[in-house]
Structure formats: structure tokens, C-alpha cells
Swiss-Prot record:
The keyword Lyase does not apply. This is Cobyric acid synthase. Transmembrane segments: none annotated. The keyword Aminoacyl-tRNA synthetase does not apply. NCBIfam families: cobQ, PRK00784.1.
Length: 484
């Protein structure tokens, strides 16, 4: 029988994902069979699991930390926002349907069975399963039918450790306040708490620990310092992008418009990690920088809607000027679709406008189709004749004259398009910048000749460093009980 523990937070972005990844790596280093699990995730950053189907990329990273194959059962419910109040629902890796917020609340009891089935699957054969909650259990307005936090924990009988973020301030109030508004049954599930993102002398918080224990009766299982290594992990959500508006001061400036429904933006992390690259995420109300050598249009969960927003910001004019100056453009997935002449959605799959004019930087057209392509892929770059490894998650088929110059051969078939002068490139392959040889050749084409790090190795090293920090700062008796 697998041991289980669930990390829940006093709020969003308290660091649960990194802590789960760190605990998974710590357990894996101790020789345990450990697996991550998140009942419900909301993210447009998706991965293709090793057994096929979509999961949140955070759970994919956690499976990497656990040194175990990823599975759709590690994240049985994935919500991919398409509009301000509506999301596509992925259940056990497959599209289940679409729902707005209130409709989804009514669906949750129906989804609980799939969540518990997946949890049983993940537990089978494991020594330890580390579960991540979503948001906070303090959102008691969402408690009825909950499958993400206490609703899951009580049904599955998983003890909870509450995580508070001291870096944002008010951590004592957030922990004590969470206990105050939980009902008695939910409070009983909490075994203790962790303080995360502490800076400075930990002994200065001794009085805080005593105060929290006095108010709640909960033991403190550790005070975790600010984990600098976590900045080398792939970005999980757009909250992180807001903080990373500008990354690096390198010789090559790359601009990325922050589309409202941006998806799979962790494609850009390998470029962000390069010291000689300045990656600029351009917010609404800002111009695309005129001195950028390359503009990357990232993935989008709603291509037609994001194309309209791109025009509202005037970025279409900025892109046209960029190309006239000799600049280069790469479009990935939804960004590739935007580069063409037209995007059509005759079945209303994206739920918005039926047709939109594209940027006409590539002579191609896209039509959305109900069948979703979801697969891991091996490819070869047509530009640089190097191997690529990545994945595809997209709706739609793109055709046109520029497709006779494919940007890559994926699983033996042509993919994407290149303009006649080679300055505009589109592809459906996510993860191409994570292929070290491709990234090196791309940067060489801009005159950068420095040695390139192995991106995967840098992520592995960061996970090991985080595991080491947790081993040093978590309560040894609690940790010994967890690791058995």
C-alpha cells in the first residue's frame, strides 16, 4: 500500500508544484518508487504523457523529478481556459467537453469517479504518492463537490500538509485563517504545515512558528528557503510570465507577445536560460521592440480570439514593420496558424468567430477540425538538418503553397512552412527549442557562437539541488516517516 501525502496551499502560487517535484526527486534518490498526482489542474501548458493524452506540464515535470514515466492518470482532470469564464475539459488525457464556470461546478461530482480511479492507478505499485492541490482549500465557496483539495483528500483518505508563502507576507494570518474557516472534518485532515520561500535567518521566525502552533495546534514540518534553483525549471503558468517580463541582457533580443490565451509558453524556457539571449515578453499596451532580431508567436488556446487581440494591440503593424526591416518570425502551433492568410473554424470549435484574416506572412490557410492531434514526436529540422524531439497538441489542418517548404519532417511527414526567403517559419512542433542542436544552430544563424548547455541536464541538476535543500530544511522525523 502506497504511502500518500497531499500538499495544499493557503493560496495560488505558494510553491506547491516545486515542493512536490522536490519531494519526488528526494524520494527517487532514496530508491523509492514515487509518483506525483494532481486531481485537477487549470493550465494551458499541457504535455503529452508517455501513455498518450494530455496532462499539465507541471505533472510531466514532477514525473521527471520522480524518474518515472508520465501518465494521464497523474492529472486526471485538466482545465484549459479558452475564454474569461469557459474552459475545455480534459479527462484522463482525452477531451471531455467544454463548460463555463457554473456548469463545471455541476459536473464535478461526475468527475470524482475518474479522479479516484486515476488515483488508484497511480498508487498501484508505488511506495509513495505525492499529491498536489489546486489553489486553496480556503475557497469554501467551491467546497461543495470539490475534487481538487479537501473534497479529494477526505474521499481518498490522504493526509494534508498546508503550505504558506512567507515571501508575499501575511503567512501567519493565511495559515491561521485557513484553519478558522475550514469545517471540522477538513481541519482533521491537516497533519501540519510548511513555510515556503523564506529569505534570511530562519531563527528569526521561531516566534512565528510558536504562534502558528499556538493558534492551530499544527506542527511545523519545515521552513523552506527561497529556492533559486526553481528559476531554472520550466515556467508553470502566466503568473510566472508576468514576473519574467524581461529575461537576460544578451546580444540577441527575442520578443514574444503575451497573448491573452497563451499556451505552452514553456517552449521558450531553453532560450530564456541562454546567457547571450534577451527574451522580452511584451505585455498589452506595449510595442514590440524595434531592435528585436526575432519575434516568436507562441501557442494559443484560442487562435482566432488571440489574433483579434493581437490586432487590438497593434502588434500586427509592429510585425509587418519588423519583417520589412529584415527581422525573422517563428510561429509555433497557434502562432503558426496566425502567420497564414486565413484561419477558419466552421464548426465553432474554439467557440468564437468563425473566420479571421491572418497576418499573411506565410502563404498558408488553416481550418479547425474536431479531431485533436496529441502525440510525442521525433523530427528533423529542414532548416538546419538536425534532430528534434517534441510533441504536438493542436486542432486544425494547415495547407498552402509555402507548405512545399516544410520547416521539419515529423514522424516521417512534412510539417510547417517556410517563406521563400526563409525568414518566416511556422511549425506545429512544441519543444523544438529544447533540442540542444537545433537551439545552437538557430542562435548561430544570428551570429551567436557560444557553447550551449544541455537543457535537460540543467533541469535535472535543478531538481537535485531542490531535493537537497528540502532534505536540509524539512523536519527529519517527518521526512523519515514519509520516506519510510
Amino acid at each position: 500500500m502506497a504511502r500518500t501525502i497531499m500538499l495544499q496551499g493557503t493560496g495560488s502560487d505558494v510553491g506547491k508544484t516545486v515542493l512536490v517535484a522536490g519531494l519526488c526527486r528526494l524520494a527517487a534518490n532514496a530508491g523509492l518508487t514515487v509518483r506525483p498526482f494532481k486531481p485537477q489542474n487549470m493550465s494551458n501548458n499541457a504535455a503529452v504523457a508517455d501513455d498518450g493524452g494530455e496532462i499539465g506540464r507541471a505533472q510531466w515535470l514532477q514525473s521527471m523529478a520522480a524518474r518515472t514515466p508520465s501518465s494521464v492518470h497523474m492529472n486526471p482532470v485538466l482545465l484549459k481556459p479558452q475564454s474569461e469564464n469557459g474552459s475545455q475539459i480534459i479527462v484522463q488525457g482525452r477531451v471531455f467537453g467544454q463548460a463555463k464556470g457554473r456548469d463545471y461546478q455541476r459536473l464535478k461530482p461526475q468527475l470524482l469517479g475518474a479522479v479516484l480511479e486515476s488515483f488508484e492507478n497511480v498508487c498501484a505499485g508505488a511506495d509513495l504518492v505525492v499529491v498536489e492541490g489546486a489553489g486553496s482549500p480556503a475557497e469554501i465557496n467551491l467546497r461543495t463537490g470539490d475534487i481538487a483539495n479537501m473534497g479529494f483528500a477526505t474521499k481518498a483518505g490522504v493526509p494534508v500538509v498546508l503550505v504558506g508563502d512567507i515571501n508575499r507576507g501575511g503567512v501567519i494570518a493565511s495559515l491561521v485563517g485557513t484553519q478558522a474557516i475550514l469545517d471540522e472534518g477538513d481541519r482533521a485532515m491537516i497533519a501540519g504545515y510548511l513555510i515556503n520561500k523564506f529569505r534570511g535567518d530562519v531563527s528569526l521566525f521561531d516566534d512565528g512558528i510558536r504562534a502558528i502552533e499556538g493558534f492551530t495546534g499544527w506542527p511545523c514540518f519545515g521552513v523552506v528557503p527561497w529556492l533559486q534553483a526553481a528559476t531554472r525549471l520550466p515556467a508553470e503558468d502566466s503568473v510566472v510570465l508576468e514576473r519574467l517580463a524581461r529575461s537576460g541582457t544578451g546580444a540577441l533580443k527575442i520578443a514574444v507577445p503575451m497573448l491573452p490565451r497563451i499556451a505552452n509558453f514553456d517552449d521558450l524556457d531553453p532560450l530564456r536560460a541562454e546567457a547571450d539571449v534577451e527574451l522580452v515578453f511584451v505585455r498589452g499596451g506595449e510595442r514590440l521592440p524595434a531592435d528585436a532580431s526575432l519575434v516568436i508567436l507562441p501557442g494559443s488556446k484560442s487562435t482566432i480570439s488571440d489574433l483579434a487581440d493581437l490586432r487590438v494591440q497593434g502588434w500586427d503593424r509592429d510585425l509587418a514593420a519588423h519583417v520589412r526591416r529584415g527581422g525573422r518570425v517563428i510561429g509555433i502551433c497557434g502562432g503558426y496558424q496566425m502567420l497564414g492568410r486565413t484561419v477558419r473554424d466552421p464548426l465553432g470549435i474554439e467557440g468564437g468567430r468563425i473566420e479571421a484574416a491572418g497576418l499573411a506572412l506565410l502563404d498558408v490557410e488553416t481550418e479547425m477540425a474536431p479531431e485533436k492531434t496529441v502525440r510525442n514526436s521525433q523530427a528533423r529540422s529542414s532548416e538546419y538538418d538536425v534532430s528534434l524531439a517534441g510533441y504536438q497538441i493542436h486542432l486544425g489542418v494547415t495547407r498552402g503553397p509555402d507548405c512545399v517548404r516544410p520547416s521539419a519532417i515529423i514522424d516521417g511527414a512534412p510539417d510547417g512552412a517556410l517563406s521563400a526567403d526563409g525568414r518566416i517559419m511556422g511549425t506545429y512542433l512544441h519543444g523544438l527549442f529544447g533540442s540542444d542542436a537545433y537551439r545552437a544552430r538557430l542562435l548561430q544563424s544570428f551570429g551567436l557562437s557560444g557553447e550551449r548547455r544541455n537543457y535537460r541536464d540543467s533541469v535535472e541538476q535543478a531538481l537535485d539541488e531542490i531535493a537537497g535543500e528540502l532534505e536540509r530544511h524539512l523536519d527529519p522525523h517527518w521526512l523519515a516517516g514519509l520516506l519510510g
